[in-house]
């Protein structure tokens, strides 16, 4: 018996093809409209912060940017003991993304349309990825939604870290009792001790300072406390995600590492803490003795050179700069501009470190690779090209050896809390507004 196959579409079925094309066109129009409106809301919110709400940003004097990650690691990690390495969950429900926008977008029609679009296309978005996770980089509107979702998480998490006694939910009752315990001790001790002495004694019973910084999915909590203190925060984080975002947070996504025994990676920085013993010969009243001093030193490795070699092929296996065949067809100024762009991005990324040997090596490799690429394009040797194109080589040198003050300005502040500098906790954030990708 003959049965029609609905999956075979003949070329004469113009009506079906027309509807299919229209459906795809309507989908793209709706997607562009939703993205434009969401960007407009983000833009209005940014303008309101820049014009009328500057005080809210100025009050947070302990904010830090991406350029201060290196000084933070070099200056503070020698005094810290444990870190909590955490990954933000990728499996996000579509309704949670809409709910994060509901607090600052009052247009109900837009929210309903966005919810309708996400519910109809969420399965196709998830199924595009082999592991079933939510990757916002593949769609602009999903990137905006994911950023708002992370922003909402951080605003609640930082509030929980600073003023956790405001929460009345069951998982944080123990934290509430601990803070009330500190208040009771303060009332008992104040009549007998001076305020300064009490602040010094309060440091012994209060939890030590807790540093927080994040990049993309990964965020790190660093502390001077014991492993028991970090285990408490591990439980707090798991309960936090499950309670406020209805997400099943796996404990294997959180790692407690001791800095003296382990290393960690963030922002492609490979950091570890080493102890260097030193022996000093001292003499008091004609009696010499040897004192053994241990100095903690933070070692930061930036494996950026190998990644550039694998992707762009700027140098060979022996480490010698080579010409790039993929850029020979471009103009001279385009080749120079692209390599300058690569170096500028790397400089903005790595210039916070006091050890810039790898950065200077990258500058040398990119400069010689650019000269050899230009010489190969003009079918001459490097020496002949440099002699014939003196003006072009001078412009190339000016681009690579621009003064550091023209590119970057760093400002460091010492932040002290209400305890007069005894208890210091800092929140590190990344303020990248635009990214120029590597050529």
Swiss-Prot record:
Q: Name the Gene Ontology biological process terms.
A: mRNA processing; RNA splicing; tRNA processing
Q: Which GO terms describe its molecular function?
A: RNA binding
Q: Which Pfam families match?
A: Intron_maturas2, MatK_N
Principal location: plastid
Which key words are in the record? mRNA processing, Plastid, RNA-binding, tRNA processing
- Sum up the protein's function in the record's words: Usually encoded in the trnK tRNA gene intron. Its retention as a freestanding gene in this organism suggests it acts in trans to assist in splicing chloroplast group II introns.
The entry assigns this protein to a family as follows:
Belongs to the intron maturase 2 family. MatK subfamily.
Protein name, please? Answer: Maturase K
């Amino acid at each position: 018996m003959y049965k029609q196959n609905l999956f075979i579409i003949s070329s004469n079925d113009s009506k079906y093809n027309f509807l299919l094309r229209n459906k795809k066109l309507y989908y793209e129009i709706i997607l562009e409209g939703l993205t434009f409106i969401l960007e407009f809301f983000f833009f209005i919110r940014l303008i309101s912060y820049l014009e009328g709400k500057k005080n809210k940003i100025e009050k947070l004097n302990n904010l830090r940017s991406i350029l201060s990650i290196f000084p933070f690691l070099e200056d503070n990690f020698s005094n810290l003991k444990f870190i909590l390495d955490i990954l933000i969950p990728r499996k996000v429900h579509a309704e949670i993304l809409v709910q994060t926008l509901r607090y600052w977008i009052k247009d109900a029609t837009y929210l309903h349309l966005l919810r309708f679009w996400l519910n109809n296309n969420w399965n196709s978005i998830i199924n595009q990825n082999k592991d079933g996770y939510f990757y916002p980089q593949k769609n602009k509107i999903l990137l905006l939604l994911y950023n708002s979702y992370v922003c909402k998480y951080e605003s609640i998490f930082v509030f929980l870290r600073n003023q956790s006694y405001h929460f009345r939910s069951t998982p944080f009752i123990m934290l509430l009792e601990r803070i009330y315990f500190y208040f009771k001790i303060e009332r008992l001790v104040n009549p007998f001790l001076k305020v300064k002495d009490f602040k010094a004694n309060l440091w012994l019973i209060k939890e030590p300072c807790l540093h927080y910084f994040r990049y993309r999915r990964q965020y790190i909590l660093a502390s001077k406390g014991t492993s028991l203190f970090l285990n408490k925060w591990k439980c707090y984080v798991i309960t936090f995600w499950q309670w406020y975002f209805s997400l099943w947070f796996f404990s294997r996504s959180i790692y407690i590492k001791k800095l003296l025994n382990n290393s960690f990676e963030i922002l492609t920085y490979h950091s570890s803490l080493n102890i260097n013993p030193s022996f000093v010969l001292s003499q008091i009243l004609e009696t010499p003795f040897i004192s053994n001093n241990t100095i903690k030193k933070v070692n930061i490795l930036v494996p950026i050179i190998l990644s550039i070699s694998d992707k762009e092929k700027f140098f060979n296996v022996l480490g010698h700069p080579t010409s790039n065949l993929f850029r020979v067809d471009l103009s001279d100024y385009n080749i120079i501009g692209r390599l300058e762009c690569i170096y500028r991005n790397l400089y903005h990324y790595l210039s916070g470190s006091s050890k810039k040997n790898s950065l200077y090596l990258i500058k040398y490799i990119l400069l010689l690779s650019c000269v050899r690429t230009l010489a190969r394009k003009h079918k001459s040797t490097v020496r002949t090209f440099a002699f014939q194109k003196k003006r072009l080589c001078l412009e190339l040198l000016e681009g690579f050896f621009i003064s550091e003050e023209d590119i970057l300005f760093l400002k460091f502040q010492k932040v002290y809390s209400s305890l007069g500098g005894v208890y210091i906790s800092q929140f590190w954030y990344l303020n990248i507004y635009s990214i120029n990708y590597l050529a």
